[in-house]
């Protein structure tokens, strides 16, 4: 598998990005990494490692898109930015996937303008796997790509989420729920109430109704749909709470419970953007080498399970 890595994105780029990439590519001979970024800087970092230059290749990209820039404007203006060059490699079939720890907005803009959206998808969402009490995972979608959503877009998220649950986790007839401030159909704002009606009418979705925030860890739902603003705040709150509890346990001299280890974003690695014509994995901005390695692992799993083709097939059934 060939992965284009945005080596300039993230709080610890390029040092930790390079370290994670070197570890991943060394494990299997069929793996290949393209480190996309400022060539001289990346070659300097690579001097610390022994690697096969035919499988770990530096691709020069002279520009970087910062967190402060307008994503859509920067994507158009900075044609040689690392995220743009890496995305073009996927578009041109020179790489099978891209991962980035940089600006999520820039990565989404590159996905839309370079890779393109699947037919019937207006906004690509990010899906996150949340461990639940049953030992399985509950998917939360969207967790940050779209802060404002219309009901029909949330319906599209539900379709993509249930497809992902089936393909990646082998769930038959995934139970899809809508995140709300109460379980009753009448709860919520105009958007959630209209979304509820759309989900209930969609025969291709096993819609089980509204769920509250406390239900996320119970395992009563396989997919939980929400807008990206709510999902991102919720995800970051879970990360912070897990860290708070873990530090308390470790401070008291106790062992770290396995459940809290599963909440650690470094173990999850990354989350895919769904609904685009190419595999794009969004990684945490604070990712270090272990998280980068696991992000590459997620990309490989999605690629091996043909996640792009399976999404397109499922969407064609719905539209048909």
Swiss-Prot record:
Per the record, the GO terms for biological process are: fatty acid biosynthetic process; phospholipid biosynthetic process
Instruction: List the catalysed reactions.
Output: a fatty acyl-[ACP] + phosphate = an acyl phosphate + holo-[ACP]
Enzyme Commission numbers on file: 2.3.1.274
GO CC terms: cytoplasm
Query: Coiled-coil region(s) at which residues?
Result: none
Keyword vocabulary terms for this entry:
Cytoplasm, Lipid biosynthesis, Lipid metabolism, Phospholipid biosynthesis, Phospholipid metabolism, Transferase
What the entry lists under SUPFAM superfamilies is as follows: Isocitrate/Isopropylmalate dehydrogenase-like
The pathway this protein participates in, as annotated, is:
Lipid metabolism; phospholipid metabolism
Query: Where found, per UniProt?
Result: Cytoplasm
Listed GO molecular functions?
Answer: phosphate:acyl-[acyl carrier protein] acyltransferase activity
Keyword NAD on entry: no
Q: Self-association or partners: how does it assemble? A: Homodimer. Probably interacts with PlsY.
NCBIfam families associated with the record: plsX
Question: HAMAP family annotated for this entry?
Answer: PlsX
* General function of this protein: Catalyzes the reversible formation of acyl-phosphate (acyl-PO(4)) from acyl-[acyl-carrier-protein] (acyl-ACP). This enzyme utilizes acyl-ACP as fatty acyl donor, but not acyl-CoA.
- Would you identify the family this protein belongs to, as annotated? Belongs to the PlsX family.
Q: What is this protein called?
A: Phosphate acyltransferase
């Amino acid at each position: 598998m060939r992965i284009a890595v945005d080596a300039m994105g993230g709080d610890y780029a390029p040092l930790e990005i390079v370290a994670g990439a070197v570890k991943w590519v060394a494990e299997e001979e069929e793996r290949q990494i393209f480190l996309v970024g400022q060539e001289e800087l990346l070659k300097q970092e690579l001097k610390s490692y022994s690697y096969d230059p035919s499988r770990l290749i530096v691709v020069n990209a002279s520009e970087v898109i910062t967190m402060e820039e307008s994503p859509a404007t920067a994507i158009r203006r900075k044609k040689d930015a690392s995220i743009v060059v890496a995305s073009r490699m996927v578009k041109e079939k020179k790489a099978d996937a891209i991962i980035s720890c940089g600006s999520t907005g820039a990565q989404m803009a590159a996905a839309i303008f370079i890779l393109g959206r699947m037919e019937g998808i207006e906004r690509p969402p990010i899906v996150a796997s949340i461990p639940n009490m049953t030992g399985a995972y509950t998917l939360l979608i969207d967790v940050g790509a779209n802060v404002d959503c219309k009901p029909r877009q949330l319906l599209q998220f539900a379709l993509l989420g249930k497809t992902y649950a089936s393909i990646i986790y082998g769930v038959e007839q995934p139970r899809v729920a809508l995140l709300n401030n109460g379980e009753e159909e009448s709860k919520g704002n105009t958007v959630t109430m209209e979304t509820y009606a759309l989900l209930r009418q969609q025969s291709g979705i096993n819609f089980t109704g509204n769920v509250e925030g406390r239900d996320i860890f119970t395992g009563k739902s396989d997919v939980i749909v929400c807008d990206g603003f709510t999902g991102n705040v919720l995800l970051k709150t879970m990360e912070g709470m897990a860290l708070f509890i873990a530090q308390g346990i470790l401070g008291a001299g106790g062992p770290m419970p396995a459940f809290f280890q599963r909440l650690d974003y470094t173990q999850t690695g990354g989350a895919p953007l769904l609904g685009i014509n190419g595999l794009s994995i969004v990684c945490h901005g604070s990712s270090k080498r272990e998280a980068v390695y696991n992000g590459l692992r997620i990309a490989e799993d999605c690629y091996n399970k043909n996640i792009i083709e399976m999404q397109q097939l499922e969407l064609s059934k719905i539209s048909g």
